[in-house]
Amino acid sequence: MICAVYKSRRKVDSYLFVEKRNVFERVPDALMKMFGEPDLVMMLPLMKRDHLGFADINKVKSELAEKGYYLQLPPPKVNLLEQHKLEIGYSRD
């Protein structure tokens, strides 16, 4: 299985995996509007891979088969100040 990977012009670090290059029929219209004009990043062969950088390869494969697309969103940003406060036990109360 080879899929096409597109990055979003609107959402930083958001990627859309689709079954075929320039085929977005199975992607919901609302998602395409939110994603914006897709920029092709690469054609990615999935059959010989056992992992991807930030996505679960098995989830990517299953969602491509079931839905025709997989949306990879960036991990949530960590508030380092709040994390540090928790680590040192700081509380306003």
Swiss-Prot record:
Organism from which the protein derives: Shewanella sediminis (strain HAW-EB3)
Name recorded for this polypeptide: YcgL domain-containing protein Ssed_2518
Domain of life: Bacteria
Cited PROSITE patterns: YCGL
Domain YcgL: from-to ranges: 1-85
InterPro entries: YcgL-like_sf, YcgL_dom
One Pfam family matching this protein: YcgL
